[in-house]
């Protein structure tokens, strides 16, 4: 044990940043090895503290480890004498620091510097092997054995030698900061477009700084090379720069035009949408419309990127005002048009109108989607819940005549804002944007005519893009009314009966088609009414096939339900979760 204690004591003096426990474990693990070998392992980094991360990049110093063995003690005992820069990294015991001739404040306390201390110590030892020689080892071994102080003159000589080796080593070995900073050579080549006199002065200063910092011997050769390269490239680039300037000037000139044309673009889009309706009434307006169509073509050709974001905001405000005025103007025209039944549009005119509106919408889509949003509400996370904005609007009673309410699941959402007559007060003109193509196709058109007194959902809406999004998606959209099972979660059909007694419950049953006979009847009703009204869109055909497929499954479910007592199932169905999720609902809230 005494030998182990002696080894630990000497190692503690040699490596004050190691804990005694770590050194004790190390010595006990390697009982048979000599002290010098343990010291060498620590200095080369083969052995580290238990909580230390190995840095394998330092292994390039491994071939020099044989020369480190004899100097390992000297590197650590004299590391604080090697100048102020290296002192905080390699601490040593306080008595050496106090007695050394160089003014250094090194504490004996163990520092938390990780393997940088031990591994870089090995590199120091390797660098010192050529210069410091045997005097350093002799002095260090004497200091370790006697724990006395050798003569001050020797230590001063050693300190001078160590300082000289450090300066040499700093020239060879760059620090991390020096490695990370970009080298000064390519910089003047990149900045060749700047003015020449300022550039030359900058190069002189940079070259002088670099000669001071990194001690380059060939700075002037570098300067000459860089000057030659620059002259060649400037000769090449002078014509190129002139052409660049010309193109830049040409690009800068048409920039004010699209900004001025944005406002007529709004008018042109709306005019293109209302044009087919207004042609029969207002023939004297045709020259204006032709002018605005020309402006539309110019706008499509002009670069859309030109207007900066700040001006687009003001343009969108002006565009909103213009839209409101124009809608107020077009509303009496539309009512006049409704009063004259002789002027009803034929199918060909409807198709032409739909095409014109589709073109206008395609051009306006980017503008409508983004610039008109109210800035505070433009983030999409608020609308993750489908039923979010519908509680704020008063609920519309579902039309329940002899006609099943949810005949067209993909159009029922749009009934709220497909009204042709009502002016929209928000920045987006939903009628001209998307309404007419859908009404042209949709069999719900008579219903939208009936409900045209209701204010559309898009009016006063702070997210116009929300309405566009839902109009273009054919999936199950939220419908209106509690009877039609409108909750953000999925409820069961029985909840409609239990919430409302009497007539309303029966209507809810009939709408949701919860019972077998009613389901079959209303399903056949749906098919006949759909085929009678108009040709089906492919989405509706898909829906009908889907419902027919569901009906087979529902009949099987029905047989099972008739066998089991229904009274037990109803309280379970009351619970909110998906336990009572049934596929026979015609108003599924989720995406199916």
UniProtKB/Swiss-Prot annotation:
Its main location: cytoplasm. One of its GO terms (molecular function) is transcription factor TFIIH holo complex binding. CDD domains: CUE_DEF1_like. GO terms for biological process: positive regulation of transcription initiation by RNA polymerase II; protein ubiquitination; regulation of protein complex stability; telomere maintenance; transcription-coupled nucleotide-excision repair; ubiquitin-dependent protein catabolic process. Residues 65-88, 100-146, 258-309, 318-343, 552-575 have a biased composition (Low complexity). Keywords: Chromosome, Cytoplasm, DNA damage, DNA repair, DNA-binding, Nucleus, Telomere, Ubl conjugation, Ubl conjugation pathway. The keyword Nucleotide-binding does not apply. It is found in: Cytoplasm; Nucleus; Chromosome, Telomere. InterPro entries: DEF1_CUE. Residues 582-592 have a biased composition (Polar residues). GO terms for cellular component: chromatin; chromosome, telomeric region; cytoplasm; nucleus. Residues 203-253 have a biased composition (Basic and acidic residues). Residues 3-47 form the CUE domain. Residues 53-343, 438-457, 494-537, 552-592 are annotated as: Disordered. Ubiquitinated. Recruits the ubiquitination machinery to RNA polymerase II for polyubiquitination, removal and degradation, when the transcription-coupled repair (TCR) factor RAD26 fails to efficiently displace stalled RNA polymerase II. Also involved in telomere length regulation. Binds DNA. Belongs to the DEF1 family. Homodimer; may form higher order oligomers. Interacts with the large RNA polymerase II subunit RPO21; the interaction is direct and serves to bridge RPO21 to the Elongin complex in a manner dependent on transcription stress. Interacts with RAD26. This is RNA polymerase II degradation factor 1. It comes from Candida glabrata (strain ATCC 2001 / BCRC 20586 / JCM 3761 / NBRC 0622 / NRRL Y-65 / CBS 138). The lineage of its organism: Eukaryota, Fungi, Dikarya, Ascomycota, Saccharomycotina.
């Amino acid at each position: 044990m005494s030998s182990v204690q002696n080894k630990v004591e000497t190692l503690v003096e040699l490596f004050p940043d190691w804990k005694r426990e770590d050194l004790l474990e190390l010595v006990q693990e390697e009982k048979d090895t000599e002290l010098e070998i343990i010291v060498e392992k620590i200095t080369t980094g083969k052995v580290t503290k238990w909580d230390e991360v190995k840095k394998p990049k330092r292994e390039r110093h491994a071939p020099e480890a044989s020369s480190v063995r004899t100097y390992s003690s000297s590197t650590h005992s004299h590391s604080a004498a090697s100048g102020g820069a290296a002192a905080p990294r390699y601490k040593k015991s306080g008595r050496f620091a106090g007695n050394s001739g160089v003014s250094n404040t090194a504490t004996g306390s163990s520092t938390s510097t990780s393997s940088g201390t031990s591994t870089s110590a090995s590199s120091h030892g390797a660098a010192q092997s050529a210069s410091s020689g045997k005097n350093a080892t002799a002095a260090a071994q004497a200091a370790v054995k006697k724990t006395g102080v050798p003569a001050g003159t020797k230590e001063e000589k050693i300190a001078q030698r160590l300082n000289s080796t450090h300066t040499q080593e700093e020239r060879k070995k760059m620090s991390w900061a020096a490695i990370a900073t970009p080298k000064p050579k390519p910089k003047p080549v990149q900045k060749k477009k700047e003015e020449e006199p300022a550039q030359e002065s900058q190069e002189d200063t940079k070259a002088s700084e670099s000669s001071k910092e990194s001690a380059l011997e060939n700075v002037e050769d570098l300067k000459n090379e860089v000057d030659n390269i620059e002259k060649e490239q400037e000769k090449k680039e002078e014509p190129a720069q002139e052409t660049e300037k010309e193109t830049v000037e040409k690009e800068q000139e048409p920039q004010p035009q699209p900004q001025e044309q944005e406002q007529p673009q709004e008018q042109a889009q709306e005019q293109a949408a209302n044009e087919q309706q207004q042609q029969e009434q207002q023939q004297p307006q045709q020259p204006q419309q032709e002018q605005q169509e020309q402006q539309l073509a110019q706008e499509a050709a002009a670069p859309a990127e030109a207007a900066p974001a700040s001006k687009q905001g003001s343009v969108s405000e002006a565009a909103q005002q213009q839209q409101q005025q124009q809608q107020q103007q077009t509303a009496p025209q539309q009512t006049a048009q409704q009063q004259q039944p002789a002027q009803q549009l034929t199918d060909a005119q409807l198709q032409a109108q739909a095409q014109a509106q589709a073109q206008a919408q395609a051009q306006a889509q980017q503008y409508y989607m983004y610039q008109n949003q109210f800035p505070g509400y433009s983030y999409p996370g608020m609308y993750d819940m489908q039923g979010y904005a519908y509680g704020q609007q008063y609920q519309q009673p579902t039309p329940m005549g002899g006609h099943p309410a949810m005949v067209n699941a993909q159009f029922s959402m749009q009934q709220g804002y497909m009204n042709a007559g009502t002016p929209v007060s928000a920045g987006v003109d939903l009628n001209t944007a998307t309404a007419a193509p859908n009404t042209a196709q949709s069999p719900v058109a008579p219903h939208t005519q009936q409900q045209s007194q209701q204010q559309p959902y898009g009016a006063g809406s702070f997210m116009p893009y929300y309405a566009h999004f839902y109009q273009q998606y054919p999936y199950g959209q939220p419908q209106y009314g509690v009877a039609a099972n409108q909750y953000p979660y999925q409820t069961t059909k029985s909840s409609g009966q239990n919430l409302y007694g009497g007539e309303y419950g029966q209507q809810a049953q009939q709408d949701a088609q919860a019972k077998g006979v009613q389901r079959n009847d209303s399903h056949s009703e749906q098919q006949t009414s759909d085929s009678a009204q108009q040709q089906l869109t492919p989405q509706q055909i898909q829906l009908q096939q889907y419902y027919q497929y569901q009906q087979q499954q529902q009949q099987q479910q029905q047989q099972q339900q008739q066998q089991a007592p229904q009274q037990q199932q109803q309280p379970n169905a009351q619970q909110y979760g998906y336990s009572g999720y049934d596929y026979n609902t015609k108003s599924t809230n989720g995406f199916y």
